[in-house]
Amino acid sequence: MSEEGQVNLKKKEKWGVAHIYSSYNNTIIHITDITGAETVSRWSGGMVVKADRDEPSPYAAMIAARRAAEEAMEKGFVGVHIKVRAPGGSKSKSPGPGAQAAIRALARAGLRIGRVEDVTPIPHDGTRPKGGRRGRRV
């Protein structure tokens, strides 16, 4: 066979970005293309469970992440870079209980995992936190 007959049809792998927003009230998994401009898939804990109290649970995050990963893989994505975000600002700076479960579920669903980074907004002395002068008294 000649060189022209054997054209190497190596397809470029499609990678995306999984934006995981995890608070103590819900977990949102939003998969976009690599630029972040086009939404590929979006699921939240509230979309997969009935009870409001179950929205932030690791189980809900796991189901939502699996469904988001399946949708992304149907559209030809082979891997994702992960950006984890907590509420941040004057609110909680630590991600909720669903963040860890969502990352593991994405990997288990068959997507390759690239970089994992924390993009929680950190205030540089921004707005005053709620709770008044002496804080929340428990």
UniProtKB/Swiss-Prot annotation:
Residues 116-138 are annotated as: Disordered. This is Small ribosomal subunit protein uS11. The lineage of its organism: Archaea, Methanobacteriati, Methanobacteriota, Thermococci, Thermococcales. One of its GO terms (molecular function) is rRNA binding. InterPro entries: Ribosomal_uS11 (IPR001971), Ribosomal_uS11_archaeal (IPR019961), Ribosomal_uS11_CS (IPR018102), Ribosomal_uS11_sf (IPR036967). GO terms for cellular component: ribonucleoprotein complex; ribosome. Belongs to the universal ribosomal protein uS11 family. Located on the platform of the 30S subunit. The keyword Transport does not apply. PANTHER family: 40S RIBOSOMAL PROTEIN S14/30S RIBOSOMAL PROTEIN S11. It comes from Thermococcus gammatolerans (strain DSM 15229 / JCM 11827 / EJ3). Part of the 30S ribosomal subunit. It comes from the Archaea. HAMAP family: Ribosomal_uS11. One of its GO terms (biological process) is translation. Keywords: Ribonucleoprotein, Ribosomal protein, RNA-binding, rRNA-binding. It holds the Pfam family Ribosomal_S11.
